[in-house]
């Protein structure tokens, strides 16, 4: 009947075109197409990837078509669930819309031992940590470590930030960044020098 057809069309439409929370999207299977709404917590400083966060979780979206998305933009992004070296992400992204200026989430203050799967891709902050290395960050992309005196965590310095080549701060610092993953290791990905203070 017409009513059943209309109901089926509405169900199909809602399944494909209405976004879900990012926490719900993270539970979808690899290969599933999803649409998420959230705030971009980074812009071009990390290259083609954009980290999108809402009140429930965060998810990176990867694609050269995202270059106009800037930090703080409220966006809707559609893409395919994919896992790259342990990091759950939307790749490829098939479409996006910039909805306007969003409200940047406050970095969640956590101990470095809490940088794990539960907070993957979210904006976090560590206080009273120190870099294990001294001297200067390598030119280009590199990985260094921070310590709280007992535990260590990898910090991935992306070569497209203004961090590479700069002096590594000595002594206790605070650092903000995105929780990433590469294979079995979780890592912190700062966006620029202002994330290290």
Give a label for each model feature.
Residues 1-23:
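Bacterial Sec-dependent N-terminal signal peptides
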Residues 20-197:
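OB-fold single-stranded nucleic acid-binding module
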């Amino acid at each position: 009947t017409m009513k059943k057809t209309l109901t089926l069309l509405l169900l199909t439409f809602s399944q494909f075109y209405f976004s879900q929370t990012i926490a719900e999207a993270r539970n979808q299977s690899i290969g599933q197409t999803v649409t998420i709404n959230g705030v971009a917590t980074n812009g071009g400083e990390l290259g083609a990837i954009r980290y999108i966060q809402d009140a429930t979780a965060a998810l990176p979206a990867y694609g050269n078509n995202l270059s106009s998305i800037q930090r703080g933009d409220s966006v809707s992004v559609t893409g395919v669930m994919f896992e790259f070296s342990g990091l759950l992400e939307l790749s490829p992204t098939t479409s996006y819309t910039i909805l306007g200026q969003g409200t940047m989430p406050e970095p969640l203050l956590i101990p470095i031992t809490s940088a794990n799967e539960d907070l993957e891709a979210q904006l976090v902050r560590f206080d009273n940590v120190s870099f294990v290395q001294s001297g200067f960050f390598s030119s280009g992309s590199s990985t260094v470590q921070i310590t709280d005196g007992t535990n260590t965590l990898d910090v991935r310095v992306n070569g497209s930030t203004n961090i590479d080549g700069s002096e590594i701060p000595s002594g206790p610092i605070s650092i903000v960044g995105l929780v990433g993953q590469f294979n079995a290791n979780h890592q912190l990905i700062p966006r620029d020098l202002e994330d290290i203070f």
